[in-house]
């Protein structure tokens, strides 16, 4: 709208009347782009480098599931503050090739007691990481004091290995569950 008004202001006991004129805006609104559901979201790599750098072919693939090796790289880069120098850390898992691009990241997080493998001694770097595993890695990387299990989510039981990690992150509003009260600890 437009018009004129007077604003009465009192400063240090002195009252002033200040005339204010509101004019019709001539600014052109900036249109909000519409995104088709079939289009992949655009990731601004300026804000994600060096933590998430995409694939060798230049793609980012934000809708893909994250592998255990990829998460190790992201968390290690965040923790270290930059990319790790080659040869500084080496993963000890028999299924992580010494020349694999993610080897040094897994080795770094192993060294910092952030990552562990499976009971059979493997790491399975190409497996999709689960929500429970991500919760454990984040809680360990942040060195959070874990809260005890109290049944926040209906599908996280007292027997789930990641229960305290999940509930700690939920308590800190870092993770959340689904509308039906579940968390999906074994889902990607």
Which ranges hold each PLM region?
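Extracytoplasmic soluble-region selector
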Residues: 1-30
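Feature responds to low-complexity, polar/acidic, surface-exposed segments characteristic
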Residues: 25-69, 75-104, 111-132, 140-164, ...
């Amino acid at each position: 709208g437009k018009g004129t008004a007077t604003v009465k202001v009192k400063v240090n006991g002195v009252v002033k009347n200040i005339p204010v004129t509101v004019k019709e805006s001539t600014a052109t609104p900036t249109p909000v782009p519409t995104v088709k559901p079939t289009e992949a979201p655009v990731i601004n790599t300026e804000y994600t480098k060096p933590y998430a750098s995409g694939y060798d072919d230049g793609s980012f693939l934000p809708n893909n599931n994250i592998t255990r090796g990829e998460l190790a790289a992201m968390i290690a880069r965040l923790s270290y503050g930059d990319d790790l120098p080659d040869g500084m850390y080496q993963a000890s898992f028999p299924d992580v090739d010494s020349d694999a691009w993610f080897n040094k990241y897994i080795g770094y997080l192993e060294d910092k007691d952030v990552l562990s493998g499976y009971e059979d001694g493997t790491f399975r770097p190409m497996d999709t990481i689960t929500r429970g595993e991500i919760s454990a890695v984040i809680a360990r990387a942040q060195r959070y004091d874990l809260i005890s299990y109290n049944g926040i989510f209906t599908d996280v039981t007292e027997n789930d290995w990641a229960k305290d990690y999940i509930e700690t992150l939920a308590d800190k509003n870092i993770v959340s569950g689904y509308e039906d009260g579940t968390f999906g600890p074994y889902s990607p």
